[in-house]
Amino acid sequence: MLSYRSFWYKFFWKGGIVLGKRIALIGIIVENPEAAEKINSILHEFSSCIVGRMGIPYRDRGVSIICVVVDAPNDTISAMSGKLGMVEGINVKTVYQKAGENA
């Protein structure tokens, strides 16, 4: 049986890479501009795990597209994606890095 210390060492740290975290891309299509305040509030809540974000206004179609790159544990990514998915007037999809790749 692993000691408490060696369990956390093996689970979270190996060769300078934090384990248990994954990279994910969250794509958001905003059809209702009034949802922007709620989206920004949620993104601010999870700002510690956001690597970067890019917003593109697509005026010809009347939508905005937001791409958010995150580096966090699965449950954090799912919580963020779930909260965003509950906002009216937007569509959210999340793409995860394969488990074990560079982790």
Predicted regions and their residues:
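Long, contiguous binding/interaction regions
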Residues: 7-103
